[in-house]
Amino acid sequence: GGAMRKNEVKSLLETRDAMECLCLRLVCEKNDVAELEKLSPILDSIRDARNADEAAERVFSFHHELAIMSGNVLLPLLYYSFKTQGEYLWSLYCKRSGVKKLYEIKLALFSTLMNKDIDSAIEQTHRIMDVAKNDLGFYGA
């Protein structure tokens, strides 16, 4: 537990940005719309989360499932290695911006994947990570 230092948050965001872009590219290449639809119940669970911590856990599940769908056997392990820190940051974001906003961000990402629009998925990911990196004071001590 406890707050993460700014340099730790920045490093985590940079690493997640790279991992996530690889993951999204592989997911788009290897999965059809029917496979991607399997993410819908996880998205619904994010929308229906009762609090920030619950939403953060469900967002982790969403990204972990994407990592599994990527077909890269290391990506789920890497995501899991950052589980505690990732959930901490998502929870902070939720407490600040609300569950609805976090859900909308993940829904937008899901929509780009369903449309096989990898460029938009990657651009969204870079933009979200950049916003977080520019707000390190909020996320890190």
Question: Language-model segments: what does each one mean?
Answer:
Residues 1-65, 104-127:
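All-alpha effector-binding/dimerization core of bacterial HTH-type transcriptional repressors
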Residues 23, 78-79:
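Short alpha-helical scaffolding segments that buttress acidic/His motifs in well-ordered protein cores
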Residues 28, 71, 84:
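Residue-level marker of positions within ordered structural domains that often coincide
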Residues 32, 36, 75-76, 91, ...:
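Secondary-structure boundary/capping residues
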Residues 43, 81-141:
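C-terminal all-alpha effector/ligand-binding and dimerization domain
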Residues 54-58, 73, 77, 96-100:
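Amphipathic alpha-helical packing segments from all-alpha helical-bundle domains
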Residues 71-73, 116-117:
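Short loop-to-helix capping motifs
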